[in-house]
Amino acid sequence: MGGRRGPNRTSYYRNPLCEPGSSGASGGGHSSSASVSSVRSRSRTTSGTGLSSPPLAAQTVVPLQHCKIPELPVQASILFELQLFFCQLIALFVHYINIYKTVWWYPPSHPPSHTSLNFHLIDFNLLMVTAIVLGRRFIGSIVKEASQRGKVSLFRSILLFLTRFTVLTATGWSLCRSLIHLFRTYSFLNLLFLCYPFGMYIPFLQLNYDLRKTNLFTHMASMGPREAVSGLARSRDYFLTLRETWKQHTRQLYGPEAMPTHACCLSPSLIRNEVEFLKMDFNWRMKEVLVSSMLSAYYVAFVPVWFVKNTHYYDKRWSCELFLLVSISTSVILMQHLLPASYCDLLHKAAAHLGCWQKVDPALCSNVLQHPWTEECMWPQGVLVKHSKNVYKAVGHYNVAIPSDVSHFRFHFFFSNPLRILNILLLLEGAVIVYQLYSLMSSEKWHQTISLALILFSNYYAFFKLLRDRLVLGKAYSYSASPQRDLDHRFS
């Protein structure tokens, strides 16, 4: 009923989607069918500002129609690790050609060598250690597959046990034998240069336990002689941290349960919790990509050069170029495996549920209705809210993100477009391939020609898989774009 407006008239409103503490779950598999009317309140118009906040009673939260992408074939973990190990061995082989090449085509009257490489200068113990380090992921995947539990036949269980025993015994014996020889041959500085990247491996990948919160390093650094007994317990806690970190590392790499799932729910708190978990999972995968790629490039390009004699000449520029090529190529291959098309689609769904807020100038919206932001509400598009003495405008269809949280803004920015990650990887891999083709055409040295031609094959395969995923996802989202636009028009 039309009452008289007055300065003391109070404007009441209800939550846009749900009352505080309530939660809902969609039952439609790939759609969130929650068309809910929002807050009823009066809005004051502006004159000349260009900003408006329509009455929430006239707005609705548009239901999200998630695109169902086709199931793309996923490469088995052990096959992927074999492919990656093979590519790294090729890069190591071509680098040894660069270092120990000879002029074997000279006539016998003045030959420095009768072979294409100076094999007598190669330290095969160092080569064995490098190969084991590069193949650590492949060895771990074999042991993981051979350690599977379940109801298997007696013959299969014996075969799995023998496989695991053979792989671990051969790897351990070869590694110990080579390390003993290296300790007897080289100085402590050389051995430190060989092993120090592993000193940063576990702390960099540490995820489940925050060492700064538990103060393990602080306690161990400040431990006095009277604290030997308590220091033993703290060291046990530290080794427990390393063990749990390694367990998370192997589960993330080789376990079939490593891929998270999307809970298509309507509870703002559950959506934010899901986003926090996905952020942690994505950061873990990026850490794994960064550490593995840099470790591979380090042992392929730098370790063989460090142990070369001072009187031996090699092309330093090509070694640095090979380091960049190996690090970028390994990063793209790992990201293509750890961030498949289904994972990109999962992040996109979570970003669509999270929404985003755009900070606006309070002077431009002083005469526009501004609602106090509450964490248990799902805000529709175009609403202005107040949070932390700032004014924000809702951008997404669903908006449950914290307006002042920069991590929520970054998550929505990167993953609101499901093709952004694949586009970046395609551009990066395409640039590497173009550069390698240009270097191959302009190369005048036989060892560089062989090196570029061999490395190109691994990049071709990675580019093909990325292009396939990009085309499939692009087609799937283009088909679902028109029904979503019709649905937006119907509810607007």
From Swiss-Prot:
Residues 31-53 have a biased composition (Low complexity). It comes from Mus musculus. Keywords: Endoplasmic reticulum, Glycoprotein, Membrane, Transmembrane, Transmembrane helix. This is Transmembrane protein 39B. Glycans are attached at residue 8. GO terms for cellular component: endoplasmic reticulum membrane. May protect the cells against DNA damage caused by exposure to the cold-warming stress and facilitates tissue damage repair during the recovery phase. The lineage of its organism: Eukaryota, Metazoa, Chordata, Craniata, Vertebrata. It is found in: Endoplasmic reticulum membrane. The keyword Cytoplasm does not apply. Pfam families: Tmp39. The chain crosses the membrane at residues 77-97, 115-135, 153-175, 185-205, 288-308, 322-342, 421-441, 447-467. Residues 1-53 are annotated as: Disordered. Belongs to the TMEM39 family. It is a multi-pass membrane protein. InterPro entries: Uncharacterised_TMEM39.
